[in-house]
């Protein structure tokens, strides 16, 4: 069995877990998440713990570890939630919340409007910062990557949209 799958997922107080064949639903204070688990993985809920194990074979051990990590992210998401912080570095780069989306000015001839999916909320503490939050870790990360993809940080001046904890590798300008 995978080393990750050996550790059970603890169910904190206030979280309700429902298992229906291969579908697991986790409900908490921040909302509810549902996911279909691979058929090669058996999931058991007992004693306020969720245990994942592979049905048979070496190839399914990795699936058991993946299922355990996904279930753990669901439990953390409905209790604490996830957030990603983005910084806009560059002259005239701004962001503001516009209805159900984020209005971005990133040096193009037109402003960009990125529509936010259900389950993700955005806050702009300043014009050059965006904080995305939600219960689904994958969805929050995907939206952050899409916004970063409009203008990734460039290596010469460091301008662009970057994650708050991202270190941009800088290059030296060409010398004559």
Swiss-Prot record:
<dbReference type="InterPro" id="IPR036789">
    <property type="entry name" value="Ribosomal_uL6-like_a/b-dom_sf"/>
</dbReference>
<comment type="subunit">
    <text>Part of the 50S ribosomal subunit.</text>
</comment>
<protein>
    <recommendedName>
        <fullName>Large ribosomal subunit protein uL6</fullName>
    </recommendedName>
</protein>
<dbReference type="GO" id="GO:0002181">
    <property type="term" value="P:cytoplasmic translation"/>
</dbReference>
<keyword id="KW-0687">Ribonucleoprotein</keyword>
<dbReference type="InterPro" id="IPR002358">
    <property type="entry name" value="Ribosomal_uL6_CS"/>
</dbReference>
<keyword id="KW-0694">RNA-binding</keyword>
<dbReference type="InterPro" id="IPR019906">
    <property type="entry name" value="Ribosomal_uL6_bac-type"/>
</dbReference>
<dbReference type="GO" id="GO:0022625">
    <property type="term" value="C:cytosolic large ribosomal subunit"/>
</dbReference>
<comment type="function">
    <text>This protein binds to the 23S rRNA, and is important in its secondary structure. It is located near the subunit interface in the base of the L7/L12 stalk, and near the tRNA binding site of the peptidyltransferase center.</text>
</comment>
<keyword id="KW-0689">Ribosomal protein</keyword>
<dbReference type="InterPro" id="IPR000702">
    <property type="entry name" value="Ribosomal_uL6-like"/>
</dbReference>
<keyword id="KW-0699">rRNA-binding</keyword>
<comment type="similarity">
    <text>Belongs to the universal ribosomal protein uL6 family.</text>
</comment>
<dbReference type="Pfam" id="PF00347">
    <property type="entry name" value="Ribosomal_L6"/>
</dbReference>
<dbReference type="GO" id="GO:0019843">
    <property type="term" value="F:rRNA binding"/>
</dbReference>
<dbReference type="InterPro" id="IPR020040">
    <property type="entry name" value="Ribosomal_uL6_a/b-dom"/>
</dbReference>
<dbReference type="GO" id="GO:0003735">
    <property type="term" value="F:structural constituent of ribosome"/>
</dbReference>
């Amino acid at each position: 069995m995978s080393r990750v799958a050996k550790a059970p997922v603890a169910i904190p107080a206030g979280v309700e877990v429902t298992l229906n064949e291969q579908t697991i639903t986790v409900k908490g204070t921040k909302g509810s998440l549902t996911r279909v688990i691979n058929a090669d993985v058996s999931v058991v809920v007992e004693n306020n713990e969720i245990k994942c194990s592979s049905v048979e074979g070496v190839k399914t051990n990795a699936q058991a570890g993946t299922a355990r990590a996904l279930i753990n992210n669901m439990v953390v998401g409905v209790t604490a939630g996830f957030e990603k912080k983005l910084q806009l570095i560059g002259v005239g780069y701004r962001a503001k919340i516009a209805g159900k989306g984020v209005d971005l000015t990133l040096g193009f001839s037109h402003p960009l409007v990125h529509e936010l999916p259900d389950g993700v909320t955005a806050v702009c503490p300043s014009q050059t910062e965006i904080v995305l939050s939600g219960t689904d870790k994958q969805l929050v990360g995907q939206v952050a990557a899409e916004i970063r993809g409009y203008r990734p940080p460039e290596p010469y001046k460091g301008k662009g949209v970057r994650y708050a904890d991202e270190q941009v590798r800088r290059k030296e300008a060409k010398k004559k």
